[in-house]
Amino acid sequence: MKKGGFSNNLKLAIPVAGEQSITKFLTQSGTFKDGDLRVNKDGVRIISQLEPEVLSPIKPADDQLSLSDLDMVKVIGKGSSGVVQLVQHKWTGQFFALKVIQLNIDEAIRKAIAQELKINQSSQCPNLVTSYQSFYDNGAISLILEYMDGGSLADFLKSVKAIPDSYLSAIFRQVLQGLIYLHHDRHIIHRDLKPSNLLINHRGEVKITDFGVSTVMTNTAGLANTFVGTYNYMSPERIVGNKYGNKSDIWSLGLVVLECATGKFPYAPPNQEETWTSVFELMEAIVDQPPPALPSGNFSPELSSFISTCLQKDPNSRSSAKELMEHPFLNKYDYSGINLASYFTDAGSPLATLGNLSGTFSV
């Protein structure tokens, strides 16, 4: 691939001139709407095509969480579109993550918020971060999410540098269970799988989060062609503008496993620099260079094979999430003897310490 030779079909997810007003997304009663999604100060729901145009008001359930019942403890994440706060329920003492997104932003981000709300509302899987409730009020969307007190794998890697084989197997077995649910049960491509979107907790659980750039296909074999997500973990077929499917997430998974095994991002910057100075040079490296692999030495052949199976340039040569669950790397260990909860705690995860709760969530 020559420098600057990206496909003319490449679609960058950037704001466009003349974006539509926020009023397009609001009803006269102040309900946030997008397609079949409705959110207001009382909650969220997905309407069916059979429901009439004039809808009955969204009514809060008796056991529903309310924003007024939550006390803010600390800001644990910031982004261009909002913040994530650690909050505590006044009556039960339970902690939650409250993601607050202001809607005075461009239409592309509003559409991404709507997509995340739809997936959160309709997904039930123990390997995805739980979304308990969503609200729209005073110009902001608020999502009450499960609080993962160990932070992200990106945070964890800063402490441990690299993760041993047996723990890697236990961690990514859980991640794959989440991907099987997304890919095969829901026909969803995550499109932004990376260490900061894999969260851990004191129970040793690992869960996938952040569905803002995910897309829903009509079936498991569906293809998409939109250029969104984090470039570092993007598959070659997505970078060049080709259509892509669930296997693009498998490429991202392979890069994440490789990074967790070595403690380093798989694509080394040129000239021994610390970081890539140009995202386009990085994307060219992903497309032009051979797939990265584990260095020879201190790694099991099963782990090396697992990563190689994920990092195939041709997506048709990659295994699916279901097929990867049968890989020897995920079946060589006795998981009853692998205590991820103790490993996360002993290895330096910032578990349950309110003075050290930064970087846990992204917006």
From Swiss-Prot:
Domain Protein kinase residues, every copy: 70-330
Modified residues (Phosphothreonine): 220, 226, 230
BP GO terms, sorted: auxin transport; cold acclimation; defense response to other organism; innate immune response; pollen-pistil interaction; response to cold; response to salt stress; xylem and phloem pattern formation
Reported modifications of this chain: Phosphorylation at Thr-220 and Thr-226 by MAP kinase kinase kinases positively regulates kinase activity. Phosphorylated by MEKK1 in response to cold. Phosphorylated by MAPKKK5.
Alphabetical UniProt keywords: ATP-binding, Immunity, Innate immunity, Kinase, Nucleotide-binding, Phosphoprotein, Plant defense, Serine/threonine-protein kinase, Stress response, Transferase
GO molecular function: ATP binding; MAP kinase kinase activity; protein serine kinase activity; protein serine/threonine kinase activity; protein tyrosine kinase activity
Active-site residues, Swiss-Prot/TrEMBL: 192 (proton acceptor)
Entry's Gene Ontology cellular component terms: cytoplasm; plasma membrane
Any Pfam family matching the protein: Pkinase
SUPFAM superfamilies linked: Protein kinase-like (PK-like)
Consequence of changing residue 99 to R: Loss of interaction with MEKK1. Phosphorylated by MAPKKK5
Residues recorded as bearing Phosphoserine in the entry: 56
Biological function: MEKK1, MKK1/MKK2 and MPK4 function in a signaling pathway that modulates the expression of genes responding to biotic and abiotic stresses and also plays an important role in pathogen defense by negatively regulating innate immunity. Plays a role in abiotic stress tolerance and plant disease resistance through activation of MPK4 and MPK6 by phosphorylation. Acts redundantly with MKK1.
Subunit structure as annotated in this protein's UniProt entry: Interacts with MEKK1, MPK4 and MPK6. May form a ternary complex composed of MEKK1 and MKK1/MKK2 and MPK4. Interacts with MPK10 and MPK11. Interacts with MAPKKK5 mainly in the cytosol.
Database matches in PANTHER family: DUAL SPECIFICITY MITOGEN-ACTIVATED PROTEIN KINASE KINASE 5-RELATED, MITOGEN-ACTIVATED PROTEIN KINASE KINASE 2-LIKE
Family: Belongs to the protein kinase superfamily. STE Ser/Thr protein kinase family. MAP kinase kinase subfamily.
Protein name, per record: Mitogen-activated protein kinase kinase 2
This protein's encoding gene: MKK2
